[in-house]
């Protein structure tokens, strides 16, 4: 019988882990019964999906607790699983602050030789 994810979300993490252990035991029993031919076509498939659903909801709950625990923490101090998912080049790119920084010599040249804007009117 299908277990709804909404029902699992109302349980605590420990209860979800207990439910997952029950589902694993049921799945093992179903696999044993499969050899004798007493199992319906979709029983094992349903049990596997129920187990996946339970483990997914458990992970969601764990991540929610982590997010609450690390709220207000800078990105560099966050665990990797809570950091934004980026590709490698974006992770290694300079930050906006680092891009804006100028050397003393660059600042001096910018002040001595400001950009000249030529206006053209007909």
Swiss-Prot record:
One of its GO terms (biological process) is translation. It holds the Pfam family Ribosomal_L29. Its main location: cytoplasm. It is found in: Cytoplasm. GO terms for molecular function: mRNA binding; structural constituent of ribosome. Residues 10-69 form a coiled coil. It comes from the Eukaryota. Keywords: Coiled coil, Cytoplasm, Ribonucleoprotein, Ribosomal protein. One of its GO terms (cellular component) is cytosolic large ribosomal subunit. Component of the large ribosomal subunit. Belongs to the universal ribosomal protein uL29 family. PANTHER family: 60S RIBOSOMAL PROTEIN L35, LARGE RIBOSOMAL SUBUNIT PROTEIN UL29-RELATED. This is Large ribosomal subunit protein uL29A. It comes from Encephalitozoon cuniculi (strain GB-M1) (Microsporidian parasite).
